[in-house]
Amino acid sequence: MTAQAKLMQYRDADCFGATLDHTIVRDLPRDPAIKRILIIKWGGMGDIVISTAIMEDIRLAFPQAELHLNTMPAWQSLFTHDPRFSRVWCVNLQQQPGRWRAYRQWLAEVAAMQYDLMIDLQTNDKSRSLLTMLRLMGKAPALLLGNHPRFPYTIHQRQRLPQAHGFQIMQQTLLCAGIPLRTFAPKLHTPPSSVASAGQLLAGHALQHKSFVVFLCGSHASGQTKRWGAKHYADLVAHYVQQGMRVVLLGGRDETEECLAIASQHPQHVVNLCGQTSLLEVPVICAQAAAIVANDTGTAHLAAATSTPMTVICGPTNPLRVKPLGQQVLALQLDVPCKNCYAKQCSHHSCMQQLTPQRLVPYLAEPKHA
């Protein structure tokens, strides 16, 4: 008889264990000449949400500065009502064709604003290339902060953390610039309109405070292997029904079929809100839930902005690098030989198929009624 793979548990202490260098390369908060700052952060939803903790520390370090954010169009709505930023602007740098036109537009936007400090929280090949062009044009500020020890950055940490969680990599960037670390959870600013609309949605389905659990059961269309599977989630519904709970499904267009498959198995106990919420309504709903079960997906990071206990199921992705922030978040992963493969396709999907609802249940946070 083949032994079962061990189910591994990951908390913040497991995922954020890299030793950070507290050496200050340049103490930027003490520089009175810094009046206007640009933060660059593109990436996926999860990466964006994690970076909001870093953005908060930047805001706290420069309380009088004018702060701008450059992000991707898909995430602009997360910051529309964010009082930390005087300006949030986007250029679609992913468009094909028209890429070079977008690059020229981006360079012109940055040059026109005459920033005193630019903080590159993206620090990938594309952002480095654009900042290099900006410097060669003579339009870059003297203060360019990034986590890569190469041109074009004028300030960067002395050590690299290639295997660390993205949150710690960004923290290290702040430390070398003398920016204190004070924020350790996502920091989103939700407008009253989103709170009200989410409340109306819950009331319309008679969903009371702490009377339901949330399943974040999908993923981006390109990350199908990160899904635990509709059958597993449908089977898990019964566990919560026995405790007098209803189940709410949240997700976007890429997750419609997954949510329909689950809801069709339990029409009396599942409320399918997939595709019916804005991004900022997700944490509002999750804050009202008794518990959350999620895949490694961007919406799990939105949910981590709340205090609701959440279990995140990982398989092909490394929980040490993708776990959402928060002591209330537990990441689980079967210790199979092929874990952390990051494959987009898989013929056996052992990391998810072998993790049955029966094995998962003992690790779930017990939902408490209001």
Positions of PLM-derived features:
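Catalytic machinery of carbohydrate-active enzymes
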Residues: 1-370
